[in-house]
């Protein structure tokens, strides 16, 4: 049994500086500080590919991480990626679309407290990730606070608390208790050949609808992007009274994809439920269903990386690719 830990930085790798915490430690440092032996149930090797606060992560970095993961499949039985928590859910979603049919467990983890701090959650999360990488099943997952969650269903829900991640609109995959993996929900596992498909178009914007949002602001943003994710209210809909955003959306949706998600954490979008939602559908808006905001954004980037045909993009967004959407 041979595992690889890929270091990318984040709080888990941070040390104090005059400007606050900054990513500074290697993956090897993290293992040593966590008290994890290289032969602790498996031979563990480390490799550092980035060392960044995850606020600084860009789509190009997802490709770098994805390539490192894909190229390691033949040599390792499981992979753990240490990552900052702020954009971890974006990275786990992006990797899930770029890497098809992973043959081994790929587990992202991080911590809310640096591993150099007393009572850090880093050792606990790292051990959880390594245990699942050793005993779990193929796919891309997030390990946090003893939970294993599907990579496309995770959102960060707390900015400071240790239990910072939840699986949204989808059950937890498993729990890790000591050296034991307690499976709760086994996802669909592809049996095709592994494929690395990293084509992304990062020129996508996410806009949260708020009362008073100017149509001219929305129009200006729409002109500068290749696709838009609109975060609407509740089950979804677009204002058309007073400041008429629906008119702008209708114009935009004739030329580029406009996808609607919701500001509500749970439940997803149903544009058939209310009149404001049906008007959005008639305007050409693509519903995100019960996808997370992170999965919606990264999936749209991935779709645009493959085609500009609006009907094809709609089909991609509505199709379940990596467990990100229910009922497709």
Swiss-Prot record:
Active site: 11, 85-86, 156, 274
Biotechnological and industrial applications of this entry: L-asparaginases are widely used in fried and baked food industries to prevent formation of acrylamide, a neurotoxin formed by the reaction of asparagine with reducing sugars. TK1656 is highly active over a wide range of temperatures and pH, reflecting its potential in the food processing industry. In addition, its high thermal stability may facilitate its handling, storage and transportation.
Keywords: Hydrolase
EC number: 3.5.1.1
Reaction(s) catalysed by this chain's protein: L-asparagine + H2O = L-aspartate + NH4(+)
Entry's pH dependence statement: Is active at a wide pH range. Optimum pH is 9.5. Optimum pH is 8.0.
InterPro entries: AsnA_fam, Asp/glu_Ase-like_sf, Asparaginase/glutaminase-like, Asparaginase/glutaminase_AS1, Asparaginase/glutaminase_AS2, Asparaginase_C, L-asparaginase_C, L-asparaginase_I
Binding of L-aspartate, residues: 11, 53-54, 85-86
Keyword S-adenosyl-L-methionine listed: no
GO biological process: amino acid metabolic process
Single GO term (MF): asparaginase activity
Keyword Magnesium part of the UniProt annotation: no
Temperature-related properties: Displays activity at a broad temperature range and is highly thermostable. Optimum temperature is 85 degrees Celsius. Optimum temperature is 90 degrees Celsius. Displays high thermal stability at optimum temperature with an insignificant loss in enzymatic activity, retaining almost 90% of its activity over a time period of 32 hours. Shows a half-life of 130 minutes at 85 degrees Celsius and 14 minutes in boiling water.
Residues annotated as domain Asparaginase/glutaminase: 1-320
CDD domains: L-asparaginase_I (cd08963)
Record remark on domains: Each subunit consists of an N-terminal and a C-terminal alpha/beta domain connected by a short linker loop. The N-terminal domain contains a highly flexible beta-hairpin which adopts 'open' and 'closed' conformations in different subunits. The high content of arginine and salt-bridges as well as the low number of Cys and Ser likely contribute to the thermostability of the dimer.
Subunit structure: Homodimer.
Function: Catalyzes the hydrolysis of L-asparagine into L-aspartate and ammonia. Also displays D-asparaginase activity, which is about 50% of the L-asparaginase activity. Does not exhibit glutaminase activity.
UniProt similarity note: Belongs to the asparaginase 1 family.
Name of this chain's protein: L-asparaginase
Organism listed in the record: Thermococcus kodakarensis (strain ATCC BAA-918 / JCM 12380 / KOD1) (Pyrococcus kodakaraensis (strain KOD1))
